[in-house]
């Protein structure tokens, strides 16, 4: 007998988010020893988190039976100290994507317009469609703020999403260009700046750094999101945050379920913020190893996007093999990269790994691109 539940009609136009392939799947499909698998498809920190973070979590294991402090005051105080903010301008979430969900449900009504880049983080579209919004996008792979501005004038969007540095392309917008753009946007449009990769962009080019406090002070219609999944190595703990004006934050809290961040996640994130030297070491490795991928691309005449994140995007066009074919070939060797076919790109997104991982990945890629 078929299911008779009257599901919402909007579900007919929705797709589930497709995450990067996990190690467990590769073990099941190809029987490869998990210790031999190189996972560079999800932009995780290949070194993991700081040892002090693991120690804090180990010591707190016995607290798993208790609900967390739902005020998350210690965590918010640590984030506030990092950004020179008051805690009433911060909301934590189960990953920054949960905070993005809060934003959409807080702001969007049926039929509202949302403006995104054509190639961008998939959850913006998914969350907006769940709210019944209409999606409008620019035509370019990388961000074109002039195109954003033209469309914004035409459709008067309720929300604009800017992902900088961008995922999955890796491009980044300069602070001056973003501020000029924001000055031309109506105050009744919320502009979300997704800064999941901001630490990487700042290290490479300080002109790409958009300070959370400054931008939200200057532009009250800006909401800034960050994560502990990338530079801090806490992807598996699922913790992120949002920063905005007090009125916006207080309304977002109305959308937040209780205890949305676990005890251990909150403790880990709070401790992670005390380890900037660890972060700096990882950033140094990222940019040193990025040069190897850029050199390889130049030698092989591979088109790529200048990246300001912890990954690089290689285009496979004119190479004889599609990105899907290359990704599958490497997958059988235990190397997980991200095929961008779901973004309508014949391209691979490659997380920058540890030096010894990159040795093997570059060797395998040379055979595929030769």
From Swiss-Prot:
Return the protein name: Histidinol-phosphate aminotransferase
Catalysed reaction(s) here are: L-histidinol phosphate + 2-oxoglutarate = 3-(imidazol-4-yl)-2-oxopropyl phosphate + L-glutamate
Q: What class of enzyme is it?
A: transferase
Q: What is its EC number?
A: 2.6.1.9
The PTM N6-(pyridoxal phosphate)lysine maps to 230
**Which Pfam families does the entry link to?**
Aminotran_1_2
Extract one GO molecular function annotation from the record. Answer: pyridoxal phosphate binding
Q: Which GO terms describe its biological process?
A: L-histidine biosynthetic process
Query: Which Gene3D superfamilies does the annotation name?
Result: Aspartate Aminotransferase, domain 1 (3.90.1150.10), Type I PLP-dependent aspartate aminotransferase-like (Major domain) (3.40.640.10)
Q: Does the keyword Transferase apply?
A: yes
Q: In which pathway does it act?
A: Amino-acid biosynthesis; L-histidine biosynthesis; L-histidine from 5-phospho-alpha-D-ribose 1-diphosphate: step 7/9
Entry's family note: Belongs to the class-II pyridoxal-phosphate-dependent aminotransferase family. Histidinol-phosphate aminotransferase subfamily.
Tell me which species this is from. Leptospira interrogans serogroup Icterohaemorrhagiae serovar Lai (strain 56601)
Q: Which gene encodes it?
A: hisC
Subunit record text: Homodimer.
């Amino acid at each position: 007998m078929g299911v008779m539940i009257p599901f919402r009609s909007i579900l007919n136009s929705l797709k589930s988010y497709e995450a990067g392939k996990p190690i467990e799947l590769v073990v099941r499909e190809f029987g490869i020893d998990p210790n031999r698998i190189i996972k560079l498809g999800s932009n995780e920190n290949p070194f993991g988190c700081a040892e002090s973070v693991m120690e804090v979590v180990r010591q707190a294991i016995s607290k798993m039976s208790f609900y967390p402090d739902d005020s998350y005051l210690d965590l918010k105080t640590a984030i506030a100290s990092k950004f020179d903010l008051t805690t009433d301008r911060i909301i934590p979430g189960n990953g920054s994507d949960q905070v993005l969900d809060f934003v959409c449900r807080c702001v969007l009504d049926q039929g509202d317009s949302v403006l995104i880049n054509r190639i961008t983080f998939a959850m913006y579209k998914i969350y907006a469609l769940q709210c019944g919004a209409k999606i409008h996008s620019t035509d370019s792979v990388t961000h074109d703020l002039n195109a954003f501005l033209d469309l914004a004038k035409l459709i008067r969007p309720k929300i604009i999403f800017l992902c900088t540095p961008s995922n999955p392309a890796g491009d980044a917008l300069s602070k001056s260009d973003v501020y000029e753009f924001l000055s031309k946007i109506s105050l009744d449009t919320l502009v979300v700046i997704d800064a999941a990769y901001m630490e990487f962009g700042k290290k490479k080019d300080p002109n790409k750094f958009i300070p959370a406090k400054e931008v939200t002070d200057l532009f009250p219609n800006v909401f800034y999101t960050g994560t502990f999944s990338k530079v801090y190595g806490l992807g598996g703990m699922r913790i992120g945050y949002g920063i905005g004006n007090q009125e916006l934050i207080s309304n977002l809290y109305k959308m937040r379920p209780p205890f949305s961040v676990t005890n251990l996640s909150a403790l880990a994130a709070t401790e992670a913020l005390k380890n900037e030297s660890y972060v700096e070491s990882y950033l140094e490795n990222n940019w040193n190893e990025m040069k190897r991928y850029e050199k390889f691309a130049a030698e092989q005449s591979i088109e790529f996007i200048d990246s300001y994140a912890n990954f690089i995007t290689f285009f496979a066009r004119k190479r004889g093999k599609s990105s899907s074919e290359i990704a599958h070939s490497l997958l059988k060797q235990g190397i997980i990269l991200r095929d961008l076919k779901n973004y309508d790109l014949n391209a691979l997104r490659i997380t920058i790994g540890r030096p010894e991982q990159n040795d093997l990945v570059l060797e395998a890629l040379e055979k595929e691109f030769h």
